[in-house]
Amino acid sequence: LYLPQAKTYDKCCAIGPSFVTSSSITNPNALTIQCSIFRNGELIFKDDSSTSLMSREFASLKKWLTKSNTVPDMTTFLTGTPIIPPPEFSLLEGDLVQISITDIGTLENRVVTV
C-alpha cells in the first residue's frame, strides 16, 4: 500500500483515548509513541517513535494554522506517520491495534469491515 492510502481508510479516523492541550503536557515535543498490533492474540508488529522527530514542533504548527485562520477550540492536529510497518503488511479484520502516547494514554481499536 502507498503510505497515504494506508492512513486514510474510508470511514475511518481513530482519535483518542482523550483530548489534551499541549499546555497540559510537560513537553509535547518529547513524547514516546508506541504501536502494537495483535492478530489472534499474538503480537505481529511493534514499533515506537517520538514527537521529538517531528519536522515542526507543536508551537510552530499552531502558529501557522492560526496565522490566517480562525481556529475553534478543540481543533485537532493530524500529522505525519512516524511508525511504518513493512510494505507487505496489511491489517485484517479482527486485528487489535494499540497506540500509546506518553502522558496521554492508550487508544485500542479492533479492525472491522464497514
What is the role of each PLM region?
Residues 1-114:
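Catalytic-pocket segment enriched in acidic/His residues
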